[in-house]
Amino acid sequence: MPVIESKIMINSESFKKNQEDHQKLIDEIRTLEQKIADNSARSKAKFDKRGQLLPRERLKRLLDPGSFWLPLSTLAGYKIGDDDGDKNIGWGNSISGIGYVAGVRCMIGVSDAGIKGGSASAMGTEKALRGAQIIFENKLPFIQLIESAGANLLRQTDMFIKGGRSFANLSKMSAMGIPTCLLYTSPSPRDATLSRMPSSA
């Protein structure tokens, strides 16, 4: 394979201008991501009273200390439906990404119960389906921490069919021999369904 040599001149004014412009966009994304975390953290007093950890605290304890974490679909649902991009920003009411657990690279999903009880949303479902696609392509083990109020019934028409596909994907993972671990951190309306899935462990 021939070597592709870069012709980018990192000391040029145009490069510096592009770098500056892109950094502003990256900073904007990081600010939005922090708003989502802050929105979830507003429920800390409620979680503390119940003796529970916030979703991101659970995730931190699950991951190998100091290990790599790649968040995915961080702005899923941004300004869609009742997401106003500010105080009601939700990230699809879930956290998704790739990280290491006991030295094994895994796809991890976490219900963000700090936001609307972790209720499933249309874009949260899309986020889960994208995660499943990555699992199938890379044969990644799947870990999900579940504390969810179930589906947002006001948006049920937007997610019913694709929500069913997420359950089908769990069965497909089982058939492919992909390790799957679903952990309930609180009783959930999804318990009755997921407990009967062949891939649940």
Walk through the language-model features, giving the residues of each.
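Conserved small/polar residues in nucleotide/adenosyl-binding loops
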Residues: 184-189
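Hydrophobic alpha-helical segments, chiefly the membrane-spanning helices
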Residues: 182-183, 195-201
